[in-house]
């Protein structure tokens, strides 16, 4: 065989031999939903939200809002489990929320009397008493941070100059 024939045979055999090997799957890069990307905040890395948790109705969304609340208001519908942040243009950003057992009892209006970034958290005495398996180790409090159940922000609701003990806060549960 000539040199050219050998090179041509080798060139034609390489793809055939490659087909005999194991197939290597290309891993798809996970899709990140805009607005839910990884964020670095005060030195804490908050991972991107897995798209499987962002099912319909679970993503923040700008929606028409005509209930008449003042721009800047935060309106919580505890039964629909939605929070609305009212804008000036007749819209609101709607968020899916969780509502604690006690949260259902909040009625009327309040105002944000305090805001905290990376708030500390202490379970109530009742939480420690009724569920020591979950809360006893945190009875002395848990400093703000990536493992704190309040998440990165908390709004403390007041009424008549007093803390109502109701909070609007983030979570470390990304489900």
Where are these regions (language model features)?
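N-terminal pre-domains immediately preceding structured catalytic cores
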Residues: 2-3, 7-8, 13, 20-175
């Amino acid at each position: 065989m000539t040199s050219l024939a050998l090179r041509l045979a080798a060139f034609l055999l390489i793809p055939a031999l490659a087909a005999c090997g194991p197939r290597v799957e290309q891993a798809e890069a996970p899709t990140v939903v805009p607005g839910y990307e990884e964020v670095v905040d005060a030195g804490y890395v908050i991972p991107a939200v897995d798209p499987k948790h962002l099912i319909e109705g679970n993503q923040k969304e700008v929606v028409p809002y005509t209930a008449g609340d003042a721009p800047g208001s935060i309106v919580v519908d505890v039964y629909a489990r939605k929070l609305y942040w009212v804008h000036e243009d007749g819209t609101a950003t709607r968020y899916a929320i969780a509502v604690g057992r006690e949260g259902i009892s909040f009625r009327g209006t309040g105002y944000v009397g305090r805001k905290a970034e990376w708030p500390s958290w202490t379970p109530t005495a009742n939480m420690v008493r009724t569920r020591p398996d979950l809360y006893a180790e945190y009875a002395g409090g848990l400093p703000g941070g990536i493992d704190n159940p309040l998440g990165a922000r908390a709004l403390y609701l007041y009424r008549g100059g007093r803390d109502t003990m109701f909070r609007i806060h983030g979570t470390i549960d990304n489900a």
